[in-house]
Amino acid sequence: MTVPARLVTTIAAPLDPASSEAPRVLHRPGRRLLVQRGDTEVVALDLDACVAGRASEVRFPAPWPRRFGTVAVSPGRDAAVFAGVHAVRSVEASGATRWEVRHGCWYGGCSLAHSSFDEYALDEDHRYADSGSVAVGADGGLVWAHVRAPLGGDAGAEGDQELWAVLDAADGRVLGRVDTMTAASGSEHTPHPDPTRMGLSVGEGEEGSPALWGRWDGQRLTAVQIGTELVLLAVSPSGGHLLTVDVGQWSLSLHRAEDGSLLRELDARDAVPPHPRSTGEGRVYWDCDAAFVDQDTIVAGTSECDARYGAARHWLVDARGMALRGEVSYPFPVSGPVRSAGDGAWYTVSEDRTSVHLWKPAGEN
């Protein structure tokens, strides 16, 4: 069975793909942004204005090249928050630094407390440092940051300790922190509609992939580990459910957000047919990206394992029973995984990374 998809719009990427990351959509309740990071700047487009044919962009100067960290943009586009090798920095579109919180160096062989990027800009080892990540909460009031200790001049913190911290987005004050008990090579945040909740997936190379779920109650940050070999993919529109995939990419799993308990799962080997051009070698497995179309519908892909055979395949999944509804049928071939675009939509990026395509199930406005 195939399920037709409708093209909502195609948006041109604002930066040259040769010197920038692929564009991505950040969405929060009532606000959707198309964000692209280059070496010298970050561009944030108002996605809904683009859909309506009214381009609206804000550009933020980058304090360091893209290989030295990650970035998030506030829902109101008043600041971009950069997670770097030695600091988390909030930058306004004018280039002014709103605040900076320094932390331990992400290069494991370095014990120095860096005061600027210039101190290691030309060092080969720091070019390949591990990294944390950062996210801005749904209402723009909180910044969530995964960093290496010590944080903001803390005394007595272990140099190899990693922290998950909640910061005041206005002034960078550290409001709360927890020890993640991880050894990251990289990490990624998964936002929740409630700004006091957030997910964190930590990649530890061959050691594992802990998935953490955090909650800020206004006084204290708490975090629970929902798995040691899981990647958080998405949160349902209601905020009640989490979607994960195991590090082997065998199964999509639906969890209760409140406590992380497993509700249902869908094994790719049992549900997804082999690619029509498959020669029988290799296995079918899920991508490490997926999206909730609505509370009861998930769109997921097998593009990574399909790549050797041709066009990517994407699938609609009934979240209520974690059962495959059918393969998504597009009006033209698409590439790569599916990612959430909010408002019942998902997006794909063209193979040359110059365009973003927004999709909805056919028949839905």
Task: Name each model-derived stretch.
Residues 1-32, 37-41, 349-365:
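Sequence/structural signature of beta-propeller modules
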Residues 159-172, 211-217, 256, 311-322, ...:
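Beta-propeller blade signature
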Residues 245-253, 267-320:
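Loop/turn-rich, solvent-exposed surfaces of beta-rich toroidal or solenoidal domains
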Residues 1-20, 53-64, 97-105, 175-176, ...:
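Aromatic (tryptophan-biased) beta-strands that constitute blades/sheets of beta-rich domains
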